[in-house]
């Protein structure tokens, strides 16, 4: 059991670090009485408690998906660039094929007009 003691201590401390911030607001929170200013409209005229399910343009979704895809591409390039002097020709050309596939995908998105904001 002594070999598992550090793991158990780590788990207890991590649970406390997670649960204490969740429990502290219950100790210091007010009764739920709200001020009328909190329920009034903002300076811009929006109600603070409106419908959260408002419609948004699908182009925002497409741009975010493209950002995630090309951001993941960059995360693949960092380890490849660090180990470039240790990998052989196969590693180099496999990354070039990966880059070519992503470039073709990017050009396809561009040709279809997913990046045009009209």
Curated annotation (Swiss-Prot):
Membrane topology value: Multi-pass membrane protein
Main location class: mitochondrion
Subcellular compartments: Mitochondrion membrane
InterPro entries for this protein: NAD(P)H_OxRDtase_bac/plastid, NADH_UbQ/plastoQ_OxRdtase_su3, NDAH_ubi_oxred_su3_sf
Protein's job: Core subunit of the mitochondrial membrane respiratory chain NADH dehydrogenase (Complex I) that is believed to belong to the minimal assembly required for catalysis. Complex I functions in the transfer of electrons from NADH to the respiratory chain. The immediate electron acceptor for the enzyme is believed to be ubiquinone.
Species of the source: Pinus sylvestris (Scotch pine)
Enzyme class: translocase
Source lineage: Eukaryota, Viridiplantae, Streptophyta, Embryophyta, Tracheophyta
Protein name (record): NADH-ubiquinone oxidoreductase chain 3
Pfam families linked to this entry: Oxidored_q4
Catalytic activities: a ubiquinone + NADH + 5 H(+)(in) = a ubiquinol + NAD(+) + 4 H(+)(out)
Gene, per the UniProt record: NAD3
EC number: 7.1.1.2
